[in-house]
Amino acid sequence: LFRPDGTPAAFVKVGLGPVADQLVATEAAALAAWARHPDPRLVVPDLLAATTWNGIRIAVVAPLPEDVRRLPPGTPSAWAVRDLDGPPSCAALADAPWWTRRTEREGDGPVRTLLEQIGDRHADATGSWARWHGDWVPWNLARCHRGLVAWDWEYSEPDAPVGLDEVHGAYQQARIVEQQPIAAALEVARLAAERLVAAGTSPGSPAELRRRAGTDEVPSPFPSARWLADLHLAMLLTRSTELERLAGTPPHDRAELLAAAEAGGRRR
């Protein structure tokens, strides 16, 4: 929406169809949560209204700051997002609500088999879980005089694996910007997980500094790079299944995703 003078007044998101309806609902809930617990490290557009019209869900979101500028190359850390629901929690995979939500929704089939393999592989690993943005990519991020700006929260979710935003951001850039096939993009995500885990245990990292100060028994929020890469794959698989359930037809790249996931599991 634009004012008479041509300046933006709001972005209006309309939930036409089951998929869009869920995305609009998710974004409205995330923005409402952010309004209750704002963090000065991140600038998030205000939720102006969340309503329905003839049964169609609508979210009205404030425009971006006037002085937003494109980010330099690279993906910034998502630490501010992780604190939205309070400090990250620690839990084994089997006890994590994020994992339970995924396994409970899956019936029999190849995705169920892949999830069981991931669950068995990391049964004894304890990781950190917190809010994630869901689409932490350069085209949803910018800078303004107040700091980092983030919008498009349609895939945000609580209790996600810490680090998922950065790993999925690397995957999305490989797929969308570089148009790499899924198998190659998964390899990019795996390398991003390795870099993140290495940085998370390096001297001077937040986790290492807390450990040295005696305030954190866990030296890193990531049990391993493979843990993070595998949970990213689980997210992709279950997101694809959920989109199929809502739309009534599988996403166009579902077969490619399953093939890449099964091939990757055989190689590891």
Positions of predicted regions on the chain:
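All-alpha amphipathic helical-bundle segments outside canonical DNA-binding/catalytic cores
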Residues: 220-233
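Conserved kinase catalytic-core helix
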Residues: 27-44, 57, 64-104, 108-139
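Regulatory N- and C-terminal appendages and interdomain linkers associated
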Residues: 246-268
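Active-site activation/catalytic loop segments of kinase-like enzymes and analogous catalytic loops
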Residues: 164-218, 233-248
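Conserved hydrophobic/aromatic residues on the N-lobe beta-strands of protein kinase domains
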Residues: 11, 58-60
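ATP-binding glycine-rich loop module of kinase domains
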Residues: 1-25
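Active-site acidic catalytic loop and adjacent metal/ATP-binding pocket
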Residues: 1-3, 120-164
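Short beta-strand micro-motifs within the conserved protein kinase catalytic domain, predominantly
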Residues: 46-55
